[in-house]
């Protein structure tokens, strides 16, 4: 397996094209973050960044999401490097805590700073980045009255109501319905899907759906 290395200068850090797993060394201990893969590039490069890591850990029979944000600076772009093996139900609560911390720190806030998920670009053989700054998460069921797009675990199956559809057809289907009152469009992800599967869904959504929206749907994890 090849590795993605990190290179830092005075004002910016750039990811170099070398790996699919991050190797971190601290106190003689090696820690890996196995990244999701995709053959679609969303954002190729991010500068002025802070890396944050969420590791896959096992303690007894329990899986743990362990966060390392020692290098994070509020005013920079945050890159979340998250292990693809973690279930979404463990990842998103940690992501929400990080979002809340950054949004609440008005003293050091930079309106231009973004948050990104990193993933391995299998075409460019380097890291690519997926923005999620404006995404709001909820660890619950959507409220009644919302129009739910459901993303199932394991088979890349997407449903609107009882109808299975392609991700590229979500907006076409939504706008074709003659609502008396247009409901909020929301996304619901199976909490037991892997983070890798979630990112693969999100990359397709960014490509075909959300880049065409002014306001992003709230994402429910349940």
Where in this protein do the model-derived segments appear?
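Long, low-hydrophobicity, acidic/polar, solvent-exposed interaction domains
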Residues: 28-222
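Bacterial Sec-dependent N-terminal signal peptides
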Residues: 1-36
């Amino acid at each position: 397996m090849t590795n993605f290395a990190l290179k830092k200068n005075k004002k910016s850090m750039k990811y170099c094209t070398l790996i699919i797993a991050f190797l971190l060394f601290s106190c003689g201990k090696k820690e890996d973050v196995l990244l999701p893969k995709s053959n679609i590039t969303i954002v190729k490069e991010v500068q002025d960044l802070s890396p944050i890591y969420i590791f896959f850990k096992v303690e007894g029979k329990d899986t743990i999401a362990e966060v390392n944000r020692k290098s994070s600076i509020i005013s920079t772009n945050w890159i979340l490097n998250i292990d693809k093996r973690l279930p979404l139900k463990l990842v998103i609560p940690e992501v929400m805590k990080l979002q809340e911390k950054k949004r609440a720190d008005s003293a050091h806030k930079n309106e231009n700073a973004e948050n990104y998920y990193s993933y391995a670009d299998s075409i460019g053989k380097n890291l690519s980045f997926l923005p999620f700054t404006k995404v709001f998460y909820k660890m619950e069921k959507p409220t009644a009255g919302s129009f739910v797009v459901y993303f199932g675990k394991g088979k890349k199956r997407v449903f609107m109501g009882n109808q299975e559809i392609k991700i590229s057809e979500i907006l076409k289907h939504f706008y074709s319905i003659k609502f008396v009152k247009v409901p909020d469009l929301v996304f619901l992800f199976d909490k037991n899907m892997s983070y890798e599967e979630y990112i693969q869904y999100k990359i397709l959504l960014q490509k075909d759906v959300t880049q065409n929206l002014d306001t992003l749907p709230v994402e429910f994890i349940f």
